[in-house]
């Protein structure tokens, strides 16, 4: 019985087996909505074509993390394609566009039409930067966007279906003991899976406590997350540590 979507469950507990079960239930529902399956793909390209799919090619944390990856791809060996399935472009969209061989805004397209466009562009590897977060296009990958489909960065949980071949992670995000709870094969990056920008600009503005109506002497605790992630178990753990 389906009782919750996969994404919010990630913040409610760290039971990877439950995460897999919920992801599989959600994926099964998505699969049932797809007709005319075809896993036949194009012949090999001269250069490998990598398609990055994201609703966050804009001023968004995923955008800031992935930017240098897109910038530093060896363009002599790879053609890089961008598929933006988010609702609104901004100045960061303009910045990232120049790092793609081709860039498509596919927000108005259906999941199945996005898969068709990817096939028409003969994408060899589809990298999903969204997972089950907002504006996800799960059915694109069930339909088949590329011969190889990878879950990376935006959603560090399993997609729970056989249509994703790999998840890019590290031994902290997915330790070997948890491989059984991932439908994908796990590809490890050394040290840390999370890409980042090498030249992040740090604000030079000095903030004062009074700007935020904070007392001058008290210790200030901060949690820079959505408040739904602060549940009784998490809060009790903080109190125990303190």
What residue spans do the PLM features occupy?
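Substrate-binding clefts and catalytic carboxylate motifs of secreted carbohydrate-active enzymes
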Residues: 222-233
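Short, intrinsically disordered, charge-balanced linker/junction segments flanking boundaries
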Residues: 240-242
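Alpha-helical solenoid repeat scaffolds of the TPR/TPR-like class and their adjacent stem/linker regions
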Residues: 1-214, 226, 236
